[in-house]
Amino acid sequence: LPDGPGWFYPPTVIADVPTEARVCREEIFGPVAPVTSFATDDEALELANDTEFGLIAYAYTRDLDRALAVAEGLESGMVGLNAGVISNPAAPFGGVKASGFGREGGREGIEEYLEVKYVGIAH
């Protein structure tokens, strides 16, 4: 940890991280960005999805069609496109795989608190 009071850890980018590294295999709830290279979008998706977790994923590109295709292929509950902070009270929040099931917030999140009743009537 850095010197100084408290538990502050400065934002850190780690380049050329091997895909089998622990930092690429676990959820890191801190300001750390492991960066690895890829040759094709398919390879990038394969690398990104090769984890048991899936809370949020990020993609950065100038090509909107490419960004949307990558977002569709990512196995995560949320995707940030060209944005690091995407939380919004009106949006559903939640992950997939070992990162959770269900959603909080947004219209989808309220469903957990509602009772649905079906009434069938013969006439």
Where are these regions (language model features)?
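Conserved C-terminal structural/oligomerization subdomain of aldehyde/semialdehyde dehydrogenase
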Residues: 4, 8-123
